[in-house]
Amino acid sequence: MASLIEKLLRTGDKKTLKTLRNYADSINALEDTFKSFTDAEIREETDRLRSRHQDGETLEALLPEAFAAVREASSRTLGMRHFDVQLMGGAALHLGNIAEMKTGEGKTLVATAPAYLNALSGKGVHVVTVNDYLAEYQSELMGRVYRFLGLTSGCILSNQDPTVRREQYAADITYGTNNEFGFDYLRDNMAWDAGELVQRGHNFAIVDEVDSILIDEARTPLIISGPAQGDTNRWYSEFSKVVLRLQPDVDYEVDEKKRTVGVLEAGIEKVEDYLGIQNLYESANTPLIGFLNNAIKAKELFKRDKDYVILDGEVLIVDEHTGRILAGRRYNEGMHQAIEAKENVEIKAENQTLATVTLQNYFRMYSKLAGMTGTAETEAAEFMSTYKLGVVPIPTNRDMQRIDQSDLVYKNEVVKFDAVVQDIAERHKNGQPVLVGTTSVEKSEYLSKLLAKEGIRHEVLNAKNHAREASIVAQAGRKGAVTVATNMAGRGTDIMLGGNAEFTAIAELSKRGLDPEENSDEYEAAWPAALAAAKQAVKDEHEEVLDLGGLYVLGTERHESRRIDNQLRGRSGRQGDPGESRFYLSLTDDLMRLFNSGAAERLMNSSVPDDVALESKLVSRAIASAQGQVEGRNAEQRKNVLKYDDVLNRQREAIYGDRRRILEGDDLHEKVQYFLEDTINSLIDAATAEGSGDDWDYNQLWANLRTLYPATVTAQEIIDEAGGKSRVTAEFLREEILSDARLVYQAREEAIGSESMRELERRVVLSVIGRKWQEHLYEMDYLKEGIGLRAMAQRDPLVEYQREGFVMFQSMMEAIREESIGFLYNLEVEVTPAEDVVVADGSAAGAHTEHHDPQIRAAGLEAPEKPAQLQYTAPGEDGGTQTRIEGRASGRSGNPAKAASQEPRKQAKKKRR
């Protein structure tokens, strides 16, 4: 079915390529004209194009001239002229597609033309890369082209403060990583003041390595979390004791491959008996399911001295690849606390989700999205279904010359690596450059020791120091170079045979103390000569390496994904260069062991000697089958993550939209009046639901009203007005109470002033929304954690999650309305009235008048207290999850709803009852 869908998706390829070629022809027709322009005239072209767009011309109509301007600017500033296929790739990006371009086709340069064209709208363009180093490098290098054309470029890096970030986003074109863009979006939606916002919208994004970012990393959502309120430690301790009474395969099941557990009926009964509850499936008990699952995982899936160690009474995570202790890292979603309870050490504060979004839903916010990669074909159907992105294969500038050899398979890892070292030694002796790909840091270091024993000089890259690695990878095509790298190391940097002239030139100018931003004019003046010298230096060596067969890529293991294998192969044979690739495998490799153990076992039992390589269709089929299983599992995980986040996303859009409008100064008076009517209507509906005026409990109704606002009308006055209890109707009661509430509100507004009241409305509603949304996220986390068990009760977990999530959202919105009204009536405030102040400014006029908004002070109306520590969880480059902990200075006590705050789980239980 997938292949059929892929064929259907590609039926329009010929038509699309024809359109792209027509664009390239139009751009080529303008080349001589733009070559004749002076630098100043090319710069003026930007102003002309921008004006034409403002006057109504579409960006598509401006594309040929804009692309021609960028091509000429790039030739003059970088000495790099766009090939026709690069212009075609750029046009594909502008049209909102994924441009599938092989490694070495210059994707970094491809992005400049569509980025420039779309920046003419003034709405900003985001170029998304896989790490900070590439973001900074590409921003600096391509920023020279943009600056030449009169545009600005910025770069978002992980440790920048908000002021710097705001400046970078204000640039015409901003580079950064997917994680940083996503976290800024979340932080903006936790902001208390408009001055804290850094992003300015989501207009157009170009995603480099789009398959890695939008596919591989999409299984892990972005999460900002902080210490949870309340004491949940008792439950962790309680459940660590409960699971000791449960037995695997009798009370619960464990799947080590998927790292999941499932509680069986017998186990559920034992837990219910132990806790003294009727039904673990009831909504009120949903939080308990998360504690139970984590306790079983801690018992069965997390092993002491393998996954973690205990040092000084603390649980410390061990990196599965390196064996190193990861100081400061903690497992998410209560897992760390469950392990602490299991080991009977101090249980530290649980983290609560403060804001979260999946990469899928973040990138779907952009008005237009595009991407580049060398390997998108295998995921074309998913790109279309999730992101509405078509994949357009762009022809190579020169025909591919690389030879991909068949795999060599050995019975075990030891003999496999012996054969790998022997192959490397032979090629190194001849001077052929070799790039060796491994699947983990541990394997890289193991191979490095074997190479050192043989006296083979080499570099080892483990995706830790991106700047150093990029410079080494760039020179990995030099004669005699041997580079061992994890599959992710040095991404985004081309390996050029004989060395990389561009990197050599940059290094030379850096030695001279020149910087492209600080010494812009000097740098531009020195660049052509430095680049020419570097090109000459690598030219002779390039010819030598060509004669040796080009770059040899050796894979020591098949990756879970065919795309990653293809990415590794694609390092060789760039721009029509010769090259060769081969994978060495063993039957004990993780992929074969976990996902095709039957085939591996049959081959292991064959009579072939251990040190003889196996080559058979059975091996090829086994590998393809194993990769298919993993890709299918990962695709299912992504689909599942998205299905559940889509439920939350609709709620998030509503809440974040409200917050943004409040921060931008919306007048909330009408909304507050709606809050008032809705809240009073709810109270009256509840009080008059049964019986008639004679039966209603007026004392209880007025007790409830007084918690909301200081009512001046009494129940007796309304009864007398109606002519007795029997003549009181719900509608009459409603009109009288609403009339009284509006009069009291009007009196409060007159007392503090209309302008002050509008500001108070904004501050209170923003504060209550912030607290209630965090509590809601907490409840939704626990709902999702336990929802899987509903399947045992013959109910669809997703449907249940949608239904209960909607009910919880409605309850939250009701609570926001009620609490906001309560604080607006009852909060004691101090007001400094608005005033116009005359300020001397030294101008000819001598002074000007500034309007100062009213200042409102009240207990709890300060900016909400920021957690002493925030934890950022995001996809890691290695395919796993990375966590960063950021300390924050504690602020003043928080929002006006603080006094009414209760532990979120208690509230969740109340609402569900």
From Swiss-Prot:
GO terms classed as biological process: intracellular protein transmembrane transport; protein import; protein targeting; protein transport by the Sec complex
InterPro entries documented for this protein: Helicase_ATP-bd, Helicase_C-like, P-loop_NTPase, SecA, SecA_CS, SecA_DEAD, SecA_motor_DEAD, SecA_preprotein_X-link_dom
Membrane topology: Peripheral membrane protein
Sites where the protein binds ATP: Q86, G104, E105, G106, K107, T108, D494
EC numbers on record: 7.4.2.8
Catalytic activity: ATP + H2O + cellular proteinSide 1 = ADP + phosphate + cellular proteinSide 2
Enzyme class: translocase
Organism superkingdom: Bacteria
Main localization category: membrane
Annotated region (Disordered), positions in chain: 865-913
Translocase recorded as keyword: yes
SUPFAM superfamilies reported in the protein's UniProt record: Helical scaffold and wing domains of SecA (SSF81886), P-loop containing nucleoside triphosphate hydrolases (SSF52540), Pre-protein crosslinking domain of SecA (SSF81767)
Coiled-coil residue spans: none
Keywords of the record: ATP-binding, Cell membrane, Cytoplasm, Membrane, Nucleotide-binding, Protein transport, Translocase, Translocation, Transport
Cellular location(s): Cell membrane; Cytoplasm
GO cellular component: cell envelope Sec protein transport complex; cytosol; plasma membrane
Molecular function, one GO term: ATP binding
UniProt-listed NCBIfam families: PRK12904.1, secA
HAMAP family (UniProt xref): SecA
Protein family (similarity comment): Belongs to the SecA family.
Function: Part of the Sec protein translocase complex. Interacts with the SecYEG preprotein conducting channel. Has a central role in coupling the hydrolysis of ATP to the transfer of proteins into and across the cell membrane, serving as an ATP-driven molecular motor driving the stepwise translocation of polypeptide chains across the membrane.
Subunit structure: Monomer and homodimer. Part of the essential Sec protein translocation apparatus which comprises SecA, SecYEG and auxiliary proteins SecDF. Other proteins may also be involved.
Name of the protein: Protein translocase subunit SecA
Organism: Paenarthrobacter aurescens (strain TC1)
